[in-house]
């Protein structure tokens, strides 16, 4: 099964709030990634999910480190695996089953992310 991770990213120069969360979904030799304002909560309202450039798979491992290019600090706070297939089109809807620290049906559609009961 493919892996996922949620990183707490602080000090990013393009983030006026000072803290956001990067959702990483393993895909081949990299991770498809979205920026979230909060940690997804089961059955909570969907939140904005901003697509980001692919991240390196090293962020799936337990770690905290400075982000290259003086772009802040990131720490992995949740991780696990997922069932399902990421669509080829990066702008297509995503529906996956998460197992691990976060559990449930992850859905990313129309720029919004939600986590619900399976």
Give the location of each predicted region.
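A charge-rich, low-complexity, intrinsically flexible signal that marks solvent-exposed coils, linkers
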Residues: 1-118
